[in-house]
Amino acid sequence: MNQNIDPILRADLQRVAEVFPHWEELRNKSVFITGATGLVGSMLVRALCAAPVEVSVIAHVRNEQKARAMFGDLPVSYCVGDVTAPVEYDGAVDFILHTASVTASKSFVTEPVQTLTTAIDGTRN
């Protein structure tokens, strides 16, 4: 596990690894995570990388350099792209976790339709 994270977060991730009851269902599976550098997505990436079973994690990100800095030496594959455009990924994917979202509060007020469209198009793509 990446050691450059807060000790409390590290302890929480270890606890998830110990108590999550469905690890066997994820053994040797691949999980594609949109919004992987966001709050929810990054926690899912870290939790899956801390799993006591082999899980292939594919992080869909807009900025690979930012993602690599965030995840350090964690065993993550990267798919670079924008969630509002069709995803170009040729590998096998067993599960998709769509966590990408517009998070700027101002956007909800100034661009409400685009905010919702981003979430909807991300699901379609």
Task: Describe every region a protein language model picked out.
Residues Q65-V76:
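Short, conserved SAM-binding/catalytic segment
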